[in-house]
Amino acid sequence: MTTPQKVAMQPITVEFPLRGDWTAVHTPAEKVPSHGVDVLGQTYAYDFMKVDWGKDGFIFHDKSTLRFFTVGVSVNDCYGFGEPIYSPVKGEVVMVEDGLKDHRWVHPIKDFLAMLVRSLYMWLSNKPNLHKIIGNYFIVKIDGMEAYAFFAHTKKNSIKVNPGDKVQYGQHVANVGHTGNSSAPHLHFHLMDQPNLLTAHGLPCNFSEYKAFNDGVWVSKRYEMPAKREQICVKEA
């Protein structure tokens, strides 16, 4: 795997890939690389989760905190699980990997240990099975540029496109899942310069339009990157 050189680049503007209220738990608005590593083209990657803003703390499920830290919660009790993903770009699908089962339960300690094992496997293996690491995923080449949109951890058998398919802005392409190296249901999204994950370099992107809840009011945002744990919203078209 190559390590890309970080250089100043203008962000590519795309549409927001989700609808309703979400938050970015990892975002290049906070730091670059956003996930702490320059691998798999994820230098400028986002992780989006759905949480309950009416509860204290960062709560992404409808069970008690005690239950979460003891026995865990079912993936079906997590707010974002199964939510539709919409294409933020116009382009052609170049790769699809689906069929991996979603993790049935979410538990902070067990998930951390499982993610650690999978990460070590990727680093130590000469030919890592990326499907097991990334979960279900697909890649779209954006029309008119050498840029590729990458979507990961999608729900089993929810990807609605195949290699060679043309996708349009706002097209329902998959559903949020909990597959691969995932600690809770979320969408991992980033842009990169080629479809080969092992050699790809990340490309920055921002979003054409969304709203952010700041200081008690909703503020319209255009061509910006959401801040970490900022409440953001995109209404249905």
Where are these regions (language model features)?
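Short glycine-rich loop/turn motifs
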Residues: 43-45, 82, 134-138
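Acidic, glycine-rich catalytic/binding loops that coordinate metals and/or anionic ligands
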Residues: 23, 33-35, 59, 128-130, ...
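Zn2+-dependent peptidoglycan hydrolase active-site motif and core
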Residues: 63-64, 70-71, 95-155
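Short, small/polar residue-rich loop motifs at catalytic or cofactor-binding pockets
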Residues: 79-81, 133, 159-160
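Terminal presequence/propeptide segments associated with secretion/organelle targeting
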Residues: 1-33, 39-41, 233-237
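A residue-level detector for short acidic-glycine micro-motifs
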Residues: 26, 50, 95, 153-156, ...
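Short, well-structured beta-strand-loop connectors
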Residues: 84-95, 160-176
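Short, charged beta-turn/beta-strand-edge "cap" motif at the junction between a beta-strand
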Residues: 98-101, 173-183
